[in-house]
């Protein structure tokens, strides 16, 4: 009868455990409204898609190889994966609290009682001695009547989800850093190609000036200027090579390789490929795909659940323990029915009465942390909007700047051709040639630098939207 009553009590408690949960259920913050960005290309919502491996839109095999190498070998990626494993393990610990704890114990002992104690005297001054063998299983279980443990599991689950998004954020940051560094390096390759061409031209010009000087058609000042221009071109080429070496070393570290092992073949083109077009009608609600915002929402959910955990401290805690096993003086008799031992209970209830305000303070802290997380999320959302607008503005303005610079580049090239032709015919001085050379070289390099910035702005746009996205 007692066993039946205990079983009924346990069953009733289990039913009650699913009836209520402390704290309030989490409600995700309102998403972004359907609105277009100020600097986005105008037009209807585009069906164009940026793949999860967003860097493939540049159609550059070397960049693709570097990105995949980084995902495989980068220590940053490995560290982020380990942080995720830790969060998932913490979730496992929290879920374990929802289940009974089972233990198995065995024991053997030899004992002898005194013959001169009251017990021994009652037995006629005899002692009791012998062996004792035992094997038993024990269990303990906290009945989650008010949902405190469920809220703790919810918090751990949200923290694991946040860690997953944080890992995605690390991957996004790393991939964007690689793309940025790579296109900076390719921009320097284009500048080096321009400088090599300029150096060859200056050598030809120096030979022309020397020939005119030897023929008495020029003066020593012109030959000195020619040597200066050639030397300046050589110095500029060495400086750009130095910058390229630095970027190459940085790329090696980003992909998880030794700086000395990275040797990218220089590109020979004097310009960069055109950046991929930004689709028109990019809606702001795509920001929900950003890993930092997704992690922020998961953190909100975790802190909201922690409020429920803190509230649960005000409610009773109910736990049940018990054991079942066998004990015998003889090992051969331990499996017999008469050797069976068991106990159920106590069904223990613990209710906080006075704690000096500890539980109330913990609840206040939990609520404040939730409100802090809400404010942080709002700040991150505004930052995300700004980053997208900045990237779109950069793309737009760099495109316009490139068009204007193309006109300047064409005019500077024409001015140099005219100045050299006039000098060869003796109509103008060599000073006009050097001025035109400098202007043409500066215009060529400026055009490459603007195109490099256009590529970097496209990378920034992809990163600002969270990398992979798909238009609704």
Region roles according to the model:
Residues 79-94, 170, 174-197, 201-204, ...:
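Amphipathic alpha-helical coiled-coil segments
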Residues 62, 74, 88-91, 95-98, ...:
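Sec/Tat-exported extracytoplasmic proteins
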Residues 2-11, 16-72, 119-120, 133, ...:
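Terminal intrinsically disordered/low-complexity segments used for targeting and assembly
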Residues 73-74, 215, 425:
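Charged, alpha-helical scaffolding/interaction elements associated with membrane systems
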Residues 25, 36, 53, 59-66, ...:
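Small/polar-residue-enriched beta-strand and adjacent coil segments characteristic
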Residues 89, 98, 116-118, 208, ...:
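Amphipathic alpha-helical coiled-coil/rod segments that serve as protein-protein coupling scaffolds
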Residues 215-315:
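Acidic, glycine-rich loop-and-beta core segments that form the ion-binding/anion-interacting portion
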């Amino acid at each position: 009868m007692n066993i039946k009553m205990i079983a009924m009590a346990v069953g009733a408690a289990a039913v009650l455990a699913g009836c209520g949960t402390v704290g309030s259920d989490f409600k995700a913050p309102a998403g972004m409204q359907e609105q277009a960005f100020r600097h986005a290309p105008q037009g209807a919502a585009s069906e164009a898609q940026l793949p999860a491996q967003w860097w493939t839109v540049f159609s550059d095999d070397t960049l693709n190889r570097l990105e995949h190498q980084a995902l495989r070998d980068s220590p940053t990626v490995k560290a982020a994966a380990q942080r995720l494993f830790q969060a998932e393990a913490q979730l496992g610990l929290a879920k374990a609290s929802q289940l009974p704890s089972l233990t198995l114990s065995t024991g053997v002992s030899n004992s002898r009682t005194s013959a001169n104690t009251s017990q021994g005297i009652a037995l006629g001054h005899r002692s009791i001695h012998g062996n004792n063998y035992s094997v038993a299983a024990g269990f303990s279980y906290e009945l989650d009547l008010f949902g405190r443990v469920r809220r703790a599991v919810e918090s751990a689950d949200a923290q694991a989800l946040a860690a997953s998004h944080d890992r995605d954020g690390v991957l996004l940051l790393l991939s964007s850093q690689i793309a940025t560094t790579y296109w900076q390096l390719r921009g320097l390759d284009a500048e080096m190609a321009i400088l090599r061409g300029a150096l060859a031209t200056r050598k030809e010009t120096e030979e022309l000036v020397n020939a005119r000087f030897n023929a008495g058609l020029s003066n020593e000042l012109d030959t000195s200027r020619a040597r200066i221009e050639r030397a300046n071109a050589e110095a500029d080429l060495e400086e750009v090579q130095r910058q390229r070496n630095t970027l190459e070393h940085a790329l090696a570290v980003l992909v998880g390789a030794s700086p000395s092992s990275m040797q990218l073949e220089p590109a020979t083109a004097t310009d960069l490929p055109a950046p991929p077009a930004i689709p028109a009608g990019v809606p702001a609600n795509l920001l929900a795909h950003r890993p930092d915002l997704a992690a922020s929402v998961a953190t909100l959910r975790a802190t909201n659940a922690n409020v429920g955990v803190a509230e649960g401290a005000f409610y009773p805690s109910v736990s049940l323990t018990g054991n079942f096993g066998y004990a015998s003086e003889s090992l051969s008799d331990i499996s017999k029915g008469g050797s069976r031992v068991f106990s159920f209970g106590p069904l223990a209830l613990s209710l906080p009465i006075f704690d000096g305000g500890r539980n109330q303070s913990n609840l206040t802290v939990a609520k404040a942390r939730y409100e802090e997380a809400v404010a942080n999320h709002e700040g991150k959302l505004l930052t995300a909007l700004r980053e997208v607008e900045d990237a779109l503005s950069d793309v737009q303005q760099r495109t316009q700047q490139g068009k204007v610079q193309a006109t300047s580049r064409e005019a500077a090239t024409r001015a140099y051709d005219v100045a050299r032709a006039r000098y060869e015919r003796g109509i103008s001085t060599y000073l006009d040639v050097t001025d035109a050379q400098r202007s043409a070289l500066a215009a060529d390099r400026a055009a490459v630098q603007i195109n490099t910035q256009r590529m970097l702005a496209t990378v920034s746009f992809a990163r600002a939207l969270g990398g992979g996205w798909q238009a609704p």
